[in-house]
Protein backbone atom coordinates (compact mmCIF):
# COMPACT_ATOMS: atom_id res chain seq x y z
CA UNK A 1 0.00 0.00 0.00
CA UNK A 2 1.02 3.64 -0.36
CA UNK A 3 0.95 4.04 3.43
CA UNK A 4 3.34 1.13 3.91
CA UNK A 5 5.58 2.50 1.16
CA UNK A 6 5.63 5.90 2.86
CA UNK A 7 6.62 4.34 6.19
CA UNK A 8 9.44 2.45 4.45
CA UNK A 9 10.76 5.66 2.90
CA UNK A 10 10.60 7.58 6.20
CA UNK A 11 13.48 6.02 8.08
CA UNK A 12 15.07 9.08 9.63
CA UNK A 13 14.52 10.18 13.21
CA UNK A 14 14.26 13.71 11.86
CA UNK A 15 11.03 12.68 10.08
CA UNK A 16 9.33 12.36 13.48
CA UNK A 17 7.97 15.21 15.62
CA UNK A 18 10.94 16.89 17.34
CA UNK A 19 13.05 14.25 15.62
CA UNK A 20 16.20 16.35 15.37
CA UNK A 21 16.14 17.13 19.07
CA UNK A 22 15.56 13.48 19.85
CA UNK A 23 18.51 12.54 17.63
CA UNK A 24 20.74 15.03 19.47
CA UNK A 25 19.70 13.40 22.74
CA UNK A 26 20.43 9.91 21.42
CA UNK A 27 23.81 11.06 20.09
CA UNK A 28 24.75 12.33 23.54
CA UNK A 29 23.51 9.12 25.12
CA UNK A 30 25.39 6.76 22.81
CA UNK A 31 28.63 8.73 22.53
CA UNK A 32 28.70 9.98 26.16
CA UNK A 33 29.86 13.33 24.74
CA UNK A 34 28.31 16.72 24.04
CA UNK A 35 29.17 16.52 20.34
CA UNK A 36 26.50 17.89 18.02
CA UNK A 37 25.40 15.93 14.91
CA UNK A 38 27.30 18.34 12.63
CA UNK A 39 30.49 17.79 14.66
CA UNK A 40 30.03 14.02 14.52
CA UNK A 41 29.38 14.19 10.77
CA UNK A 42 32.51 16.30 10.19
CA UNK A 43 34.59 14.03 12.42
CA UNK A 44 33.48 11.10 10.30
CA UNK A 45 34.35 12.88 7.05
CA UNK A 46 37.81 13.76 8.35
CA UNK A 47 38.43 10.22 9.54
CA UNK A 48 37.26 8.79 6.22
CA UNK A 49 39.78 10.99 4.40
CA UNK A 50 42.60 10.02 6.78
CA UNK A 51 41.90 6.30 6.62
CA UNK A 52 41.45 6.33 2.84
CA UNK A 53 44.91 7.92 2.48
CA UNK A 54 46.39 5.18 4.69
CA UNK A 55 44.62 2.53 2.62
CA UNK A 56 46.04 3.98 -0.59
CA UNK A 57 49.51 3.91 0.98
CA UNK A 58 49.12 0.24 1.92
CA UNK A 59 48.04 -0.62 -1.63
CA UNK A 60 51.08 1.18 -3.05
CA UNK A 61 53.49 -0.54 -0.66
CA UNK A 62 51.94 -3.94 -1.40
CA UNK A 63 53.13 -3.70 -5.00
CA UNK A 64 49.62 -4.21 -6.35
CA UNK A 65 49.21 -2.65 -9.77
CA UNK A 66 45.68 -1.42 -10.07
CA UNK A 67 43.04 0.91 -8.68
CA UNK A 68 41.50 0.96 -5.20
CA UNK A 69 38.41 -0.83 -6.51
CA UNK A 70 40.54 -3.46 -8.23
CA UNK A 71 42.48 -4.08 -5.02
CA UNK A 72 39.35 -4.49 -2.91
CA UNK A 73 37.87 -6.77 -5.57
CA UNK A 74 41.08 -8.84 -5.42
CA UNK A 75 40.72 -9.11 -1.64
CA UNK A 76 37.07 -10.12 -1.94
CA UNK A 77 37.48 -12.72 -4.67
CA UNK A 78 40.91 -14.37 -4.56
CA UNK A 79 40.64 -17.87 -3.03
CA UNK A 80 43.91 -17.43 -1.08
CA UNK A 81 42.08 -15.11 1.31
CA UNK A 82 39.42 -17.61 2.40
CA UNK A 83 39.38 -20.67 4.61
CA UNK A 84 38.31 -23.88 2.93
CA UNK A 85 36.61 -25.36 5.98
CA UNK A 86 34.87 -24.15 9.12
CA UNK A 87 37.59 -25.83 11.20
CA UNK A 88 40.31 -23.91 9.36
CA UNK A 89 38.56 -20.61 10.04
CA UNK A 90 38.06 -21.32 13.75
CA UNK A 91 41.66 -22.53 14.12
CA UNK A 92 42.83 -19.31 12.50
CA UNK A 93 41.02 -17.20 15.08
CA UNK A 94 42.35 -19.34 17.92
CA UNK A 95 45.92 -19.13 16.62
CA UNK A 96 45.70 -15.33 16.56
CA UNK A 97 44.38 -15.28 20.13
CA UNK A 98 47.21 -17.53 21.32
CA UNK A 99 49.72 -15.22 19.67
CA UNK A 100 48.10 -12.20 21.35
CA UNK A 101 47.96 -13.60 24.90
CA UNK A 102 51.69 -13.38 25.76
CA UNK A 103 51.83 -9.79 24.50
CA UNK A 104 49.14 -8.56 26.90
CA UNK A 105 51.28 -8.15 30.07
CA UNK A 106 53.54 -5.80 28.11
CA UNK A 107 50.60 -3.43 27.59
CA UNK A 108 48.36 -3.89 30.63
CA UNK A 109 49.18 -3.88 34.33
CA UNK A 110 45.99 -5.75 35.20
CA UNK A 111 44.35 -8.56 33.24
CA UNK A 112 41.04 -10.30 33.94
CA UNK A 113 40.94 -13.62 35.79
CA UNK A 114 38.02 -14.70 33.62
CA UNK A 115 39.08 -17.22 30.92
CA UNK A 116 37.81 -16.96 27.37
CA UNK A 117 37.31 -19.17 24.37
CA UNK A 118 36.49 -18.95 20.68
CA UNK A 119 33.60 -21.00 19.33
CA UNK A 120 31.38 -20.94 16.29
CA UNK A 121 27.97 -19.32 16.19
CA UNK A 122 25.39 -22.15 16.29
CA UNK A 123 24.34 -23.25 12.82
CA UNK A 124 20.66 -22.48 13.44
CA UNK A 125 21.52 -18.81 14.01
CA UNK A 126 24.55 -18.28 11.79
CA UNK A 127 22.76 -17.31 8.58
CA UNK A 128 21.11 -14.27 10.16
CA UNK A 129 24.00 -13.29 12.43
CA UNK A 130 26.82 -10.83 11.88
CA UNK A 131 30.48 -11.84 11.43
CA UNK A 132 31.14 -12.19 15.17
CA UNK A 133 30.01 -11.17 18.63
CA UNK A 134 31.20 -11.47 22.22
CA UNK A 135 29.25 -12.86 25.15
CA UNK A 136 30.58 -12.20 28.64
CA UNK A 137 31.24 -14.91 31.19
CA UNK A 138 30.26 -15.28 34.83
CA UNK A 139 32.52 -16.10 37.76
CA UNK A 140 29.44 -16.99 39.80
CA UNK A 141 28.19 -19.52 37.26
CA UNK A 142 31.66 -20.74 36.26
CA UNK A 143 31.11 -19.70 32.64
CA UNK A 144 33.93 -18.35 30.48
CA UNK A 145 33.57 -15.42 28.12
CA UNK A 146 33.24 -16.37 24.46
CA UNK A 147 34.07 -14.82 21.12
CA UNK A 148 31.49 -16.31 18.76
CA UNK A 149 32.72 -16.54 15.17
CA UNK A 150 30.42 -16.99 12.19
CA UNK A 151 31.53 -19.90 10.00
CA UNK A 152 28.54 -19.71 7.65
CA UNK A 153 29.28 -18.69 4.03
CA UNK A 154 33.06 -19.01 4.19
CA UNK A 155 33.44 -16.93 1.04
CA UNK A 156 32.39 -13.86 3.08
CA UNK A 157 34.89 -14.41 5.95
CA UNK A 158 38.23 -13.12 4.62
CA UNK A 159 41.47 -13.99 6.39
CA UNK A 160 42.69 -10.41 6.11
CA UNK A 161 40.14 -9.20 8.67
CA UNK A 162 40.76 -11.98 11.19
CA UNK A 163 43.55 -10.32 13.20
CA UNK A 164 41.62 -7.10 13.79
CA UNK A 165 38.41 -9.01 14.52
CA UNK A 166 40.05 -11.31 17.08
CA UNK A 167 41.72 -8.43 18.93
CA UNK A 168 38.37 -6.60 18.96
CA UNK A 169 36.20 -9.44 20.25
CA UNK A 170 38.60 -11.28 22.56
CA UNK A 171 41.81 -9.87 24.06
CA UNK A 172 42.61 -7.03 24.47
CA UNK A 173 39.12 -6.08 23.26
CA UNK A 174 35.67 -6.88 24.63
CA UNK A 175 36.75 -9.76 26.85
CA UNK A 176 39.37 -7.70 28.67
CA UNK A 177 37.20 -4.61 29.14
CA UNK A 178 33.95 -6.34 30.07
CA UNK A 179 35.56 -8.95 32.31
CA UNK A 180 37.58 -6.38 34.24
CA UNK A 181 34.41 -4.35 34.77
CA UNK A 182 32.68 -7.42 36.23
CA UNK A 183 35.68 -8.10 38.49
CA UNK A 184 35.79 -4.63 40.04
CA UNK A 185 35.81 -5.07 43.83
CA UNK A 186 33.04 -3.66 46.01
CA UNK A 187 31.19 -2.23 43.04
CA UNK A 188 27.43 -2.23 42.53
CA UNK A 189 26.30 -4.83 39.95
CA UNK A 190 24.71 -2.03 37.93
CA UNK A 191 28.12 -0.45 37.41
CA UNK A 192 29.71 -3.82 36.65
CA UNK A 193 27.18 -4.60 33.94
CA UNK A 194 26.24 -1.17 32.58
CA UNK A 195 27.17 -0.78 28.93
CA UNK A 196 27.58 2.35 26.80
CA UNK A 197 28.01 1.65 23.12
CA UNK A 198 30.47 4.48 22.55
CA UNK A 199 32.77 3.19 25.26
CA UNK A 200 32.43 -0.55 24.62
CA UNK A 201 32.88 -0.31 20.86
CA UNK A 202 35.43 2.46 21.25
CA UNK A 203 37.47 0.13 23.42
CA UNK A 204 37.15 -2.57 20.78
CA UNK A 205 38.47 -0.19 18.13
CA UNK A 206 41.31 0.85 20.45
CA UNK A 207 42.15 -2.84 20.95
CA UNK A 208 42.41 -3.27 17.18
CA UNK A 209 44.85 -0.35 17.02
CA UNK A 210 47.17 -2.12 19.50
CA UNK A 211 47.76 -4.88 16.98
CA UNK A 212 50.87 -3.27 15.51
CA UNK A 213 52.57 -3.13 18.94
CA UNK A 214 51.57 -6.75 19.51
CA UNK A 215 53.22 -8.00 16.32
CA UNK A 216 50.19 -8.15 14.04
CA UNK A 217 49.34 -6.52 10.67
CA UNK A 218 52.77 -7.39 9.25
CA UNK A 219 51.42 -8.27 5.81
CA UNK A 220 49.66 -5.57 3.75
CA UNK A 221 46.41 -7.50 3.56
CA UNK A 222 45.92 -7.75 7.33
CA UNK A 223 46.91 -4.09 7.68
CA UNK A 224 44.32 -3.20 5.06
CA UNK A 225 41.83 -5.31 7.01
CA UNK A 226 42.52 -3.29 10.15
CA UNK A 227 42.02 -0.06 8.21
CA UNK A 228 38.82 -1.49 6.74
CA UNK A 229 37.47 -1.91 10.26
CA UNK A 230 38.47 1.67 11.09
CA UNK A 231 36.76 2.84 7.92
CA UNK A 232 33.61 0.96 8.87
CA UNK A 233 33.33 3.05 12.05
CA UNK A 234 34.16 6.35 10.35
CA UNK A 235 31.68 5.78 7.53
CA UNK A 236 28.91 5.07 10.02
CA UNK A 237 29.48 8.44 11.70
CA UNK A 238 28.81 10.06 8.33
CA UNK A 239 25.93 7.81 7.27
CA UNK A 240 24.05 7.80 10.58
CA UNK A 241 24.08 11.58 10.91
CA UNK A 242 23.44 11.89 7.20
CA UNK A 243 20.26 9.81 7.35
CA UNK A 244 18.85 10.87 10.70
CA UNK A 245 19.81 14.54 10.79
CA UNK A 246 20.73 15.81 7.33
CA UNK A 247 18.00 14.19 5.26
CA UNK A 248 19.96 11.59 3.30
CA UNK A 249 17.88 8.92 1.58
CA UNK A 250 18.45 5.22 2.19
CA UNK A 251 20.03 4.87 -1.25
CA UNK A 252 22.38 7.80 -0.63
CA UNK A 253 23.53 6.19 2.60
CA UNK A 254 24.10 2.77 1.02
CA UNK A 255 25.94 4.27 -1.95
CA UNK A 256 28.28 6.25 0.31
CA UNK A 257 28.96 3.14 2.38
CA UNK A 258 29.68 1.00 -0.69
CA UNK A 259 32.12 3.55 -2.10
CA UNK A 260 34.45 3.20 0.86
CA UNK A 261 33.91 -0.12 2.58
CA UNK A 262 34.90 -3.58 1.39
CA UNK A 263 32.41 -5.73 3.31
CA UNK A 264 29.75 -7.77 1.54
CA UNK A 265 26.33 -6.36 0.74
CA UNK A 266 24.58 -8.03 3.67
CA UNK A 267 26.72 -6.19 6.19
CA UNK A 268 26.37 -2.93 4.25
CA UNK A 269 22.58 -3.06 4.36
CA UNK A 270 22.61 -3.86 8.08
Q: Which stretches of residues belong to each language-model region?
A:
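N-terminal maturation segment of proteins
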Residues: 1, 5-263, 270
